[in-house]
């Protein structure tokens, strides 16, 4: 990958990782329009690491408070709202871990196509619109509970299907369960930490096992670009949804799905 390709794809990944619009749907477009080949494991390591660092940096105070409360709850047995939230995040991660280890190969083989990505982009865009329209109660993330956390975790596991969008699926589920828009987004972002950490570790292992020559310059550039893009994305996404809701992202998903359908049928 040349420098231009690294920058463009890292920008796309960083900007779309935390928006409910599907990063896989966007990464397929450069391949279709410019004939770019698969990005390779080095790029996957870079963008996973950059996105993880961005969400950890943005929510550093919340994560530190949660981690401190969680470790204290293990030692003392006493639960606070921060420790409960930590346990719910852990619970919500389990479905994605199970599906990821048991069905990743099957999903990559049978669902990683432009037809599937186009369909899921549109279908889950409509579900996001419906969930946002129906959202009424406005719970915060400290009121989730283990049942809601598990349902949101199942939605995250479904997002392993390309085009679904991890943040889109989890935010949709959270809205359906009565969380406010901001709380749904924050819970989704916090959920991304263990998932992104696990993905970064697994992809790094795959890279080391593959024996590929590592392009450290491209790796470093990808981390920096995806970190900056993801950090900015998180900040402005939270501001946008508090004022405009999910409608802009629904419209965008439907338009993107239409473009992908154009590649299929034209």
UniProtKB/Swiss-Prot annotation:
Keyword Cell wall biogenesis/degradation assigned: yes
Record-level GO cellular component terms: plasma membrane
Domain of life according to the entry: Bacteria
EC number(s) recorded for this UniProt protein: 3.6.1.27
Any one GO MF annotation of this record: undecaprenyl-diphosphatase activity
Keywords, in A-Z order: Antibiotic resistance, Cell inner membrane, Cell membrane, Cell shape, Cell wall biogenesis/degradation, Hydrolase, Membrane, Peptidoglycan synthesis, Transmembrane, Transmembrane helix
Location within or outside the cell: Cell inner membrane
Signal peptide positions (record): none
One Gene Ontology biological process: regulation of cell shape
Transmembrane domains' residue ranges: 1-21, 39-59, 87-107, 111-131, 144-164, 183-203, 218-238, 246-266
Topology class, membrane: Multi-pass membrane protein
Catalytic activity field: di-trans,octa-cis-undecaprenyl diphosphate + H2O = di-trans,octa-cis-undecaprenyl phosphate + phosphate + H(+)
Family the entry assigns: Belongs to the UppP family.
Role description: Catalyzes the dephosphorylation of undecaprenyl diphosphate (UPP). Confers resistance to bacitracin.
Note: Bacitracin is thought to be involved in the inhibition of peptidoglycan synthesis by sequestering undecaprenyl diphosphate, thereby reducing the pool of lipid carrier available.
Descriptive protein name: Undecaprenyl-diphosphatase
